Amino acid sequence: MHFSSSSTLFTCITLIPLVCLILHASLSDAQLTPTFYDNSCPNVSNIVRDTIVNELRSDPRIAASILRLHFHDCFVNGCDASILLDNTTSFRTEKDAFGNANSARGFPVIDRMKAAVESACPRTVSCADLLTIAAQQSVTLAGGPSWRVPLGRRDSLQAFLDLANANLPAPFFTLPQLKDSFRNVGLNRSSDLVALSGGHTFGKNQCRFIMDRLYNFSNTGLPDPTLNTTYLQTLRGLCPLNGNLSALVDFDLRTPTIFDNKYYVNLEEQKGLIQSDQELFSSPNATDTIPLVRSFANSTQTFFNAFVEAMDRMGNITPLTGTQGQIRLNCRVVNSNSLLHDMVEVVDFVSSM
């Protein structure tokens, strides 16, 4: 079909409401597909990749940080870029949630990425898809698998602070708590939990999140008994009592900047950095996760295959599609005059059909 934007906009404004409602319903049923931007913004992945490559020169942590942003976005109302929104008078930002405050990072990189994409393809690529592509590219650039992610998401109109506080897994979670957290967002396979936890194969963590493990586990005055004793002494040297709680420690002591399967080798040796990681192998409830840890430790390709599958499943958690939500021009704020702007998006969407 071919319409001029002005004629279609006039038609949508003047036609009886039922016709526009039917149009809206049909567009809202759109499905995610890796080819979504093949015609409208074919270079989006290259733009994202180039932005990350430039940032890695000065910030080797950024790839892991972007992957974490995507994870924390998808666990709160689906992958809708709600984590990128700043505070407004209408809602509190998810950046202030317990799992994000003083730890979520990489927002300026996403800003630069979005500006570059907007310059090449105005009003086309959502922030939700941008963050999804950025997570995939970050993994690949760090030595992990390469795959084409399903696309076509749109951006939320608000943030969800309370939901972020309720949904984001904590570093002190037990295995049953982790399973509940994943199950609550539709990730009910043990392989989802174990494979996605492998995102901790690169990146860093702050001392504040492991102090109890090192010195006062479960208020016993003793360290976590599942910690390898040699590794315990190493961590205590990096995170001493009364030390800097913001000091950084590598998640993976073997290959801290490479996306590989060494995270699982560490778990087998009781060298998981945070409690929720080691729970996958050392919990009394780990009968279903231990075989997966061993399988991934034995085969990088087995881990990569499971990780890609789990990432696609996570990326498909209740996405906004079609005419739901909007395509933000600035990932930090909802578009002003959003009703008129979103109507223009509908016109553009129909005109491309």
Curated annotation (Swiss-Prot):
The modification Pyrrolidone carboxylic acid is found at residue 31. Substrate binds at residue 169. Keywords: Calcium, Disulfide bond, Glycoprotein, Heme, Hydrogen peroxide, Iron, Metal-binding, Oxidoreductase, Peroxidase, Pyrrolidone carboxylic acid, Secreted, Signal, Vacuole. Ca(2+) 2 binds at residues 201, 252, 255, 260. Glycans are attached at residues 43, 87, 188, 216, 228, 244, 285, 298. Its main location: secreted. It catalyses: 2 a phenolic donor + H2O2 = 2 a phenolic radical donor + 2 H2O. It is found in: Secreted; Vacuole. Gene3D superfamilies: 1.10.520.10, Peroxidase, domain 2 (1.10.420.10). One of its GO terms (molecular function) is heme binding. This is Peroxidase C1A.
